[in-house]
Amino acid sequence: MKKISILGSTGSIGTQTLDVIREHGDMQVVALSCGRNLSLIEKQAREFKPQFVSVSDENDAKKLRTSLADTDIEVGYGMDGLIRCATIEPCDIVVTAIVGMLGIRPTIAAIKAKKTIALANKETLVTAGHIIIPLAKEYGVSILPVDSEHSAIFQSLQGNSMNPIKKILLTASGGPFRGRKLSELEGIRVEDALKHPNWSMGQKITIDSSTMVNKGLEVIEAKWLFDVDLSQIQVVVHPQSVIHSAVEYADGAVIAQLGTPDMRIPIQYALYYPSRPALSGDRLDLFKLKDLTFEAPDLDTFKGLALAMKAARAGGNIPTAFNAANERAVALFLNKKIKYLEIIDIIEACMENASFIENPSVDEILDTEQCAYDYISKRW
């Protein structure tokens, strides 16, 4: 029986991971972590009976410890708690589903503890791919992608390890504002940006999808995961979200993964790889598909993707400045402190303000993040 630890169990990916585990009943949850959602993590802890749970705040940990006093579950908090979740024994797979650069240190700890990583925290590779990927190779650790697009690429690579990749076709829905021009995005409200046409996701990633910043982050993640040059990654807007991504080989063959927009499918593939057990849910009916369409991204309107590509080409700590600026800008927008288009203004300003470091350490990555936050606090 595989033993699973989930970092970020109360978020969208975390809850769907538990849905998969619940459906099959043949995996054991050994650790859970969350931010501040005490009521949900208590319910999860009572249902799945992990050895250890962790929350972000010490006072919340005291409350949860009291709530779970009738159980044998240990409660921790903060970064120490996250690292304990990531390294707990016995454990086979660590699902990293926390948002942001908070995932870097726990992921490094999990790799050093030789845990298989089911990666849903794209920011870890965006900001620290130059550290994470060599470390995983050094420790012989597999990093299995949970993002639907990267899972699709991973699946399209199976059985083709000896064949050279010509191109990765990274698909994007285009988000709720596909087809609009920049001038039409002036008055976008939070409620508008949270209406994704195809996927059910958390608030932050839904906003990122609307700006296409998310696709930019995924480009950088794909570069590290699949060891390809940026020039080999092509973003393709595919509004139906049926083809989740594809790989073109040197002979011209294109292998793609298709399916319904259900995040449980890539989650399950990461948990059970290389097996494919049955999973409940809607099936893809080709006869009901009216058409599949493809178009190039509009980089003039969706500057977030263009800026991500610029950050990726610059390398060093610039992707960190890009990511940190976006995280803070999205939070400000969700709290109605800035306008929608200011998200991109903030990202661009922070990238220009960052002091370049070619090969940043973890501490330098986190310093770059803090510098971006400080810069935003002063200007916005």
Curated annotation (Swiss-Prot):
Pfam family membership, one: DXP_reductoisom
One of the GO biological process terms: isopentenyl diphosphate biosynthetic process, methylerythritol 4-phosphate pathway involved in terpenoid biosynthetic process
GO molecular function, one term: NADPH binding
Binding positions for NADPH per the UniProt entry: T10, G11, S12, I13, G35, R36, N37, N121, E123, G202
E.C. code: 1.1.1.267
Chain positions recorded as Mn(2+) binding sites: D147, E149, E218
Listed cofactors: Mg(2+); Mn(2+)
Keyword Transferase on entry: no
Keyword set, alphabetical order: Isoprene biosynthesis, Manganese, Metal-binding, NADP, Oxidoreductase
The keyword NADP appears for this protein: yes
Listed SUPFAM superfamilies: 1-deoxy-D-xylulose-5-phosphate reductoisomerase, C-terminal domain (SSF69055), Glyceraldehyde-3-phosphate dehydrogenase-like, C-terminal domain (SSF55347), NAD(P)-binding Rossmann-fold domains (SSF51735)
Pathway of action: Isoprenoid biosynthesis; isopentenyl diphosphate biosynthesis via DXP pathway; isopentenyl diphosphate from 1-deoxy-D-xylulose 5-phosphate: step 1/6
Family statement: Belongs to the DXR family.
Biological function: Catalyzes the NADPH-dependent rearrangement and reduction of 1-deoxy-D-xylulose-5-phosphate (DXP) to 2-C-methyl-D-erythritol 4-phosphate (MEP).
Protein name, entry field: 1-deoxy-D-xylulose 5-phosphate reductoisomerase
